[in-house]
A protein has these predicted regions:
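Short hydrophobic/aromatic patch on the recognition helix
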Residues: 31, 163, 167, 211-212, ...
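Short, Lys/Arg-enriched, Trp-marked, Pro/Gly-tolerant hinge/linker segments that flank
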Residues: 68, 91-156, 169-181
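Terminal helix-turn-helix DNA-binding modules in bacterial transcription factors
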Residues: 146-150, 169-213, 229
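Alpha-helical residues within the helix-turn-helix
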Residues: 154, 165, 169, 202-203, ...
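…primarily DNA-binding HTH/wHTH and HhH modules…
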Residues: 213-229
Length: 229
């Protein structure tokens, strides 16, 4: 785990990246960018054949983006700026061709582009309550588990009503929404590792691949097949 004095953007030019903080996990498929504000302890994960680019923002620009971890769709212009700021070899050599004022302008345009983009529903919030943590651990280890919330509650000594309230109050979503987010996160990793759609659907708890495709498309914005290509 690491922590920076400046906020930073992590761009997935290829493959799937993940950014883990105390708030949860940001899932970063290709052509998305994750924002981590200054002061957040975090670590990155890479899955498949990845191309990770990192751009730090000064405090003057960081104030213009959310104060919490977030994931954004990357426009064509934002993508070109990210690649320019990091260079073809993913270092800062290309950026040396620009003076400081030009680099500042590029970063400002990048932030403007993020303002125009909507936050993506690709964050898996981390529970704080011990009971939710126990359920989360079980589902992390077995994302295909279709056990109901009531059955999971009996295993840890909590009612389904109590757990539903905790999911809503702590994580801002229902249990089924959270589990779907978790499954899509695992699906993105499996797709990045080269598995086909049917295998991924079954491995992540969908008996019917068409239902998996619909859930995946709703969250990621493209079908699993198109995402793989």
């Amino acid at each position: 785990m690491q922590c920076h004095a400046r906020g930073h953007l992590v761009y997935a030019g290829r493959g799937v990246l993940s950014v883990h903080t105390e708030r949860g996990t940001s899932i970063v498929p290709a052509n998305r960018v994750a924002w981590t504000p200054a002061g957040f302890t975090h670590c990155h994960g890479a899955h498949g054949n990845t191309d990770m680019r990192v751009v730090f923002l000064p405090a003057s620009l960081a104030r213009l983006v959310p104060g919490h971890p977030a994931v954004f769709m990357v426009s064509g212009l934002a993508r070109e700026i990210l690649l320019t700021l990091t260079g073809p070899r993913n270092d800062d050599r290309a950026a040396r061709d620009y003076d400081r004022a030009a680099l500042a302008r590029l970063r400002r345009v990048l932030v403007d582009e993020l303002h125009e983009a909507h936050e993506q529903p690709l964050r898996l919030p981390a529970p704080r309550d011990d009971r939710l943590q126990a359920i989360a651990q079980m589902l992390y280890e077995s994302p295909a588990d279709n056990t109901s919330l009531a059955e999971l509650g009996r295993a840890i000594g909590a009612s389904a009503r109590t757990l539903s309230r905790l999911f809503h109050n702590e994580l801002g979503m229902t249990f089924y929404e959270w589990r779907t987010q978790l499954r899509i996160y695992h699906a993105l990793i499996l797709l990045a590792d080269g598995h086909d759609t049917t295998h991924v659907a079954h491995a992540c708890g969908w008996a019917n691949p068409s239902h998996f495709i619909a859930a995946f498309t709703k969250l990621v914005g493209t079908t699993p097949g198109r995402h793989r290509t």
